[in-house]
UniProtKB/Swiss-Prot annotation:
CDD domains: TS_Pyrimidine_HMase. HAMAP family: Thymidy_synth_bact (MF_00008). This is Thymidylate synthase. Gene3D superfamilies: Thymidylate synthase/dCMP hydroxymethylase domain. (6R)-5,10-methylene-5,6,7,8-tetrahydrofolate binds at H51, D169, A263. Pathway: Pyrimidine metabolism; dTTP biosynthesis.
Length: 264
């Protein structure tokens, strides 16, 4: 994943020093895109070890429509703890918007199920979009959606996905985001009897936090290794029926992990 390292270097070379909501400070670029051919390997960063358990469980948590950290904590995933209240609640974050977007008539819209249905029955639609950016509920969310919306595209028997991420912590968050949406694309493709195409990542405010500079410099000294392969061991009845045990990453040989503080 040379493109990931190239982005880090570009931010260091061309970025603007900016303040931010957390008070940490960043070096930031506006607007960047990367494309990953999912048939050529699973895009999991190899220049540091990524916590795959957290990536998989978080995605399953989103797909379940869950917005409480209890499931995550039960499975040893702590990535949302800093934002949860004393009861583990986060407000109507990703899972709620994906699965239960509130409509004007009082009903709710399951955007994920609608996306599956459209991919299967109307694959040429240009409206196969899932949005977490619900303006009317942003104030109720513990954290406004960073990966705000994504679109699916079907061509030549392949399913591609493009994500728009309005705000991106490149050192800590981006490896998770790329792997998570690549995994989702594989799952959706399997459910819809398609091959995988590309995952396209588009970032808005793309930044490195000022307290991640040493870690970034270390990572830039490392040479990327071959990408691993994702194996999905079974095809469940629906996109909502996958289990953690259904996934295996083969051939993942990363450099050692690099710890860094989370900006809250």
């Amino acid at each position: 994943m040379r493109a990931y390292l190239d982005l880090m270097q570009k931010i260091l070379d061309e970025g603007t020093v900016k303040s931010d909501r957390t008070g940490t400070g960043t070096i930031s670029l506006f607007g960047h895109q990367m494309r990953f051919n999912l048939a050529e390997g699973f895009p999991l960063v190899t220049t540091k070890k990524c916590h795959l358990r957290s990536i998989i469980h978080e995605l399953l948590w989103f797909l379940n429509g869950d917005t409480n950290t209890a499931y995550l904590k039960e499975h040893g995933v702590s990535i949302w703890d800093e934002w949860a209240d004393e009861n583990g609640d986060l407000g109507p974050v990703y899972g709620a918007q994906w699965r239960s977007w509130p409509a004007a008539d009082g009903s709710v819209i399951d955007q994920i199920q609608k996306a599956v249905d459209d991919i299967k029955h109307n694959p040429d639609s240009r409206r196969i979009i899932v949005s977490a950016w619900n303006v009317g509920e942003l104030d109720k969310m513990a954290l406004a959606p960073c990966h705000a919306f994504f679109q699916f595209y079907v061509a030549d028997g392949k399913l591609s996905c493009q994500l728009y991420q309005r705000s991106c912590d490149v050192f800590l968050g981006l490896p998770f985001n790329i792997a998570s949406y690549a995994l989702l694309t594989h799952m959706m493709a399997q459910q819809c009897d398609l091959e995988v195409g590309d995952f396209v990542w588009t970032g808005g405010d793309v930044h490195l936090y000022s307290n991640h500079m040493e870690q970034t410099a270390l990572q830039l000294t490392r040479e990327p290794r071959p990408l691993p392969t994702l194996v999905i061991k079974r095809k469940p009845d629906s996109i909502f029926d996958y289990k953690f045990e259904d996934f295996e990453i083969e051939g993942y040989d990363p450099h050692p992990g690099i710890k860094a503080p989370v900006a809250i």
